[in-house]
């Protein structure tokens, strides 16, 4: 299955799985989690706080960034 989502205003296509969760975007979108670049990591799907295990679907709008 293939879906396209928007990550930080950039279209990203996920391929190779039957279903996807938030954490799967890290396989397709370059975001460094190894170094803290703020006080907290913000993870949203369609404007709502998301956990890494949250399912995502076609057209989801995803924000992931460090907040100070």
Regions of interest found by a model, annotated:
Residues 1-68:
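Ubiquitin-like/PB1-type beta-grasp interaction modules and other compact soluble beta-rich domains
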């Amino acid at each position: 299955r293939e879906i396209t989502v928007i990550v930080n205003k950039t279209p990203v296509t996920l391929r190779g799985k039957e279903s996807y969760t938030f954490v799967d975007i890290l396989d397709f979108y370059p975001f460094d989690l190894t170094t803290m670049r703020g006080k907290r990591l913000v993870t949203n799907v369609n404007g709502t706080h998301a956990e890494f295990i949250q399912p995502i679907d076609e057209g989801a709008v995803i924000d992931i960034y460090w907040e100070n």
